[in-house]
C-alpha cells in the first residue's frame, strides 16, 4: 500500500511539562488548528479531547499518555500528550522512549519547576531532540526572557529564542518571528485572523539584538555557516531555518517559542516549528537491538526493512485489550502473525487502529515510523518487542522506576475478591510501575505505586471500571533490602520419610550487583556436579526468596549470585528439593553479607514566603531531611532537600498550618538510601514475622 505521507514528512512528537504549564490546552489547540476537532475543549471544563479517562476529566490533569494523529502542511504529526504529575512518571518515560522529538511546555510565570527537570532528564536519557514553548504569556507576571534564562541555567540547555512576544500579560497582541523577521498580529479571539507585518518600530532594537544572537548560535551548528557568518555577519532566512533544524537534530540547539494556548496565540507557529525543526524518523539514529546470537544490530526506518516495533503501552478497552506500538521498521499487516521476541511467543494481529483520542480509525497496515494500536495481542506487555519471526530482534526496552509506596486492599465480599483479581491483572498489564503482592503474614493483597495520587487513581479505577468494593489501608513505605558485603552460602535440603526421599544441595557465592540490576544469577556449575535440570529450580528458589526478602520481608535488590557447587542424589533429588535448597543457600549467604534496609529518598522542593523560611528548614531537618539548597526570588524562598518518604506523610497539611496556607511543595522519588541503624532495627523487629 502506498504511503499517505513519505517518512521525511512524518513527525512523532510528545508534549511534556510540569503540572499546570498548559500542556493539554496546547495539545487541544493543535488539534483545533489542524482540523482534528472543530470545537475548542478546555481542561478546566473537563472537555479536553486527550483527557478521556473519567478521573482525568474530573481532576483536570492528564494521567495517561494519549496518542493522537493529525496533519499540518502536508506532514503527518503523531502527538503524545503526557502527564506532568510526578506520580505518572512512567507515562512520560514510555512516551520519551518512542518519540523522535518533544515540545517542552513551560509556564511564563512559574518557569522551570522541579518536574520540568525530571521531564528534561527523561528526554536526555533517550536523546530526544526538543523545542520549548513558553506558554501563558497572557498571565500576570509572565516573563519570557526570565524563563529563557532559567532553561539555560537550570537545565543546562543551549536555548535560543526564535520568537519574541509583542506585549505581555493582558497586552499580549502578537509574536515576532525572529527567523523571518516579521510580526504576527492576532486580530480575533480564536487566533485565526492573523496579520503578518513588519516589526513594530518600538521593538526594532530588541529584535535586532536577539536576531544577531540567533544567527551566532545557529552558525555554531555548521562549519559552512560559521564561515559565512564570520565573513558577512549575516545568514539568510533559509540558512537560519536549515541551521536550526541541524542543531535540533544533533542536540546542539533548543529553539524557544512563546505564546498563550488558552488565548489562541502562537499555536500555529508551534506547528510550523514542529514541521520545520523537529526530526522525522529517518533523521534520528536507527533503533538498536540484540539478535538471538547476542550480537548488536540496527533496524533502519524503512518499510522494506524487516518488521520491528515496540509495545509501549497496554490499555484495557471496552472492545478488548489495546496495545500501543511504535513502528520502527517494516510493515505490520492486519491478520498476520508476528513474534514477541521478548517472551519468545507468536502473536496474531487481529485489528489495527490509529487513534484520535477516544475516537479510532481502523487501518489495514502500519508502516515504519507510525504510532498505532493493535487489538488481539494476548501476552504482550509494556516494553516487549514485536518483530518478524524470520528475522527476530529484541529492541532496547523501557526504564521502569521502582514503586515507593503501598497500600493494603481488602475486598468486602467473595464476589469482590474475584473482581479484584481481574482488576489487578488488568491494571498491572497497563502500568509497569503498579505492583501487586500478597503479604505472607496477613494474607492481604498489597498494591504498590509511585505516590499517593497514583494509588488513589488506581483504587478509584478499580471501583469505577471493575466495580470492586474494598477497604483500603493506610499508605506504607516500600522499603528494599540489599547487601553491602560478599560471602558464600550453602543450602542442603534432605528429608527421609519412608519411600522416596528429598535431596538437594546448593552452594553459592553472593556479591553486591550493579545499581538497578535487581537479581542477577550466574551458573558456574561445571562437570555436571549438579545436573542441568536442577539449575533452573535452584535459581527460581533464590529469585522467590529475593522477592520476599530475608531480613524484614521487603524485596532484595541489586544482588549477584553465582551457583558454584552442590550435589545431588540419583533417586531422591527433585526440582522441588533444589528449589528449597536454593532458597536456603540464598538466605544463608544474605545473612553473612552485611544486609541493610533501604528507604526511598524524595527530592522535595518547597516554596514559601521569606518569613517562614526558618520554620520550614527546621521542620525538614526534624524529618531527617538534608537541605541541599535555598534561593530567594522576589520575597519567595525556594528550598530543595532530600527527605525520607517515611517522614513525608501528612506534610501538605503541616506545611499549610506552618505557613498560613501560603506554602507549596512538590515531591518526587530520588533514590534509595540506607536506613539509619536505630530506625532500621524498629522496622525489622516490626516486620520480622514476614521474613
From Swiss-Prot:
Domain of life per record: Bacteria
Gene Ontology molecular functions: GTP binding; GTPase activity; translation elongation factor activity
Domain tr-type G residue range list: 8-282
UniProt xrefs under SUPFAM superfamilies: EF-G C-terminal domain-like, P-loop containing nucleoside triphosphate hydrolases, Ribosomal protein S5 domain 2-like, Translation proteins
InterPro entries: EFG_II (IPR041095), EFG_III (IPR009022), EFG_III/V (IPR035647), EFG_IV (IPR047872), EFG_V (IPR035649), EFG_V-like (IPR000640), EFTu-like_2 (IPR004161), G_TR_CS (IPR031157)
Pfam family, one: GTP_EFTU_D2
Protein residues bound to GTP: 17-24, 81-85, 135-138
Role played: Catalyzes the GTP-dependent ribosomal translocation step during translation elongation. During this step, the ribosome changes from the pre-translocational (PRE) to the post-translocational (POST) state as the newly formed A-site-bound peptidyl-tRNA and P-site-bound deacylated tRNA move to the P and E sites, respectively. Catalyzes the coordinated movement of the two tRNA molecules, the mRNA and conformational changes in the ribosome.
Listed name of the protein: Elongation factor G
Annotated GO biological process: ribosome disassembly
Main subcellular location: cytoplasm
Keywords attached to this entry: Cytoplasm, Elongation factor, GTP-binding, Nucleotide-binding, Protein biosynthesis
Amino acid at each position: 500500500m502506498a504511503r499517505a505521507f513519505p517518512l521525511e514528512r512524518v513527525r512523532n512528537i510528545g508534549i511534556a511539562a510540569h503540572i499546570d504549564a498548559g500542556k493539554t490546552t496546547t495539545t487541544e489547540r493543535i488539534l483545533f488548528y489542524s482540523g482534528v476537532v472543530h470545537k475548542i475543549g478546555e481542561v478546566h471544563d473537563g472537555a479536553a479531547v486527550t483527557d478521556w479517562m473519567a478521573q482525568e476529566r474530573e481532576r483536570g490533569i492528564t494521567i495517561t499518555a494519549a496518542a493522537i494523529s493529525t496533519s499540518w502542511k502536508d506532514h503527518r504529526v503523531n502527538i503524545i500528550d503526557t502527564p506532568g504529575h510526578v506520580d505518572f512518571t512512567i507515562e512520560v518515560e514510555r512516551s520519551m522512549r518512542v518519540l523522535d522529538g518533544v515540545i517542552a511546555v513551560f509556564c511564563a510565570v512559574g518557569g522551570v519547576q522541579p518536574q520540568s527537570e525530571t521531564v528534561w532528564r527523561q528526554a536526555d536519557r533517550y536523546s530526544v531532540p526538543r523545542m520549548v514553548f513558553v506558554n501563558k504569556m497572557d498571565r500576570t507576571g509572565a516573563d519570557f526572557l526570565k524563563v529563557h534564562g532559567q532553561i539555560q541555567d537550570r537545565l543546562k540547555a543551549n536555548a535560543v529564542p526564535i520568537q519574541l512576544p509583542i506585549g505581555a500579560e493582558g497586552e499580549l497582541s502578537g509574536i515576532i518571528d525572529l527567523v523571518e523577521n516579521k510580526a504576527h498580529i492576532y486580530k480575533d479571539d480564536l487566533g485565526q485572523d492573523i496579520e503578518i507585518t513588519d516589526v513594530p518600530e518600538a521593538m526594532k532594537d530588541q529584535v535586532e539584538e536577539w536576531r544577531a544572537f540567533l544567527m551566532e548560535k545557529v552558525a555554531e551548528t555548521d562549519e559552512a555557516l560559521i564561515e559565512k557568518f564570520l565573513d558577512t555577519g549575516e545568514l539568510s532566512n533559509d540558512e537560519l531555518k536549515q541551521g536550526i533544524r541541524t542543531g535540533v537534530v544533533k542536540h546542539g540547539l533548543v529553539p524557544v517559542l512563546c505564546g498563550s494556548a488558552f488565548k489562541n496565540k502562537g499555536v500555529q507557529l508551534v506547528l510550523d516549528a514542529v514541521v520545520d525543526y523537529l526530526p522525522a524518523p529517518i533523521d534520528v539514529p536507527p533503533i538498536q537491538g540484540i539478535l538471538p546470537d547476542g550480537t548488536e544490530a540496527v533496524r533502519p526506518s524503512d518499510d522494506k526493512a524487516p518488521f520491528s516495533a515496540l509495545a509501549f503501552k497496554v490499555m484495557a478497552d471496552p472492545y478488548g485489550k489495546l496495545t500501543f506500538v511504535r513502528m520502527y521498521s517494516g510493515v505490520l499487516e492486519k491478520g498476520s502473525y508476528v513474534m514477541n521476541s521478548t517472551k519468545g511467543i507468536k502473536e496474531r494481529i487481529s485489528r489495527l487502529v490509529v487513534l484520535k483520542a477516544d475516537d479510532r480509525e481502523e487501518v489495514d497496515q502500519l508502516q515504519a515510523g507510525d504510532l498505532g494500536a493493535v487489538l488481539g495481542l494476548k501476552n504482550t506487555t509494556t516494553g516487549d518487542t514485536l518483530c518478524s519471526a524470520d528475522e527476530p530482534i529484541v529492541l532496547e526496552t523501557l526504564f521502569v522506576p521502582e514503586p515507593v509506596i503501598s497500600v493494603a486492599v481488602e475486598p468486602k465480599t467473595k464476589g469482590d475478591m474475584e473482581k479484584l483479581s481481574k482488576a489487578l491483572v488488568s491494571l498491572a498489564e497497563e502500568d509497569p510501575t503498579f505492583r501487586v503482592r500478597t503479604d505472607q503474614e496477613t494474607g492481604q493483597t498489597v498494591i504498590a505505586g509511585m505516590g499517593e495520587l497514583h494509588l488513589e487513581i488506581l483504587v478509584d479505577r478499580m471501583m469505577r471500571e471493575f466495580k470492586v468494593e474494598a477497604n483500603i489501608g493506610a499508605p506504607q513505605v516500600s522499603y528494599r533490602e540489599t547487601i553491602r558485603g560478599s560471602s558464600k552460602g550453602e543450602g542442603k535440603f534432605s528429608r527421609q520419610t519412608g519411600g522416596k526421599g528429598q535431596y538437594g544441595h546448593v552452594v553459592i557465592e553472593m556479591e553486591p550487583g550493579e545499581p538497578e540490576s535487581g537479581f542477577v544469577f550466574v551458573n558456574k556449575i561445571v562437570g555436571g556436579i549438579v545436573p542441568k535440570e536442577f539449575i533452573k529450580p535452584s535459581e527460581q528458589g533464590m529469585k522467590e526468596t529475593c522477592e520476599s526478602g530475608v531480613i524484614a520481608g521487603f524485596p532484595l535488590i541489586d544482588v549477584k549470585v553465582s551457583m558454584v557447587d552442590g550435589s545431588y542424589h540419583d533417586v531422591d533429588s527433585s526440582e522441588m528439593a533444589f528449589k528449597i535448597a536454593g532458597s536456603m543457600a540464598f538466605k544463608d549467604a544474605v545473612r553473612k553479607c552485611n544486609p541493610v534496609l533501604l528507604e526511598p529518598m524524595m527530592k522535595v522542593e518547597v516554596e514559601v514566603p521569606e518569613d517562614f523560611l526558618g520554620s520550614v528548614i527546621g521542620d525538614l531537618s526534624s524529618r531527617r531531611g538534608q537541605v541541599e539548597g535555598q534561593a530567594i526570588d522576589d520575597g519567595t524562598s525556594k528550598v530543595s532537600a532530600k527527605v525520607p518518604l517515611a517522614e513525608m506523610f501528612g506534610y501538605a497539611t503541616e506545611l499549610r498550618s506552618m505557613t498560613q496556607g501560603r506554602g507549596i511543595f512538590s515531591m518526587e522519588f530520588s533514590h534509595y538510601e540506607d536506613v539509619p541503624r536505630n530506625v532500621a532495627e524498629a522496622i525489622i523487629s516490626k516486620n520480622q514475622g514476614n521474613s
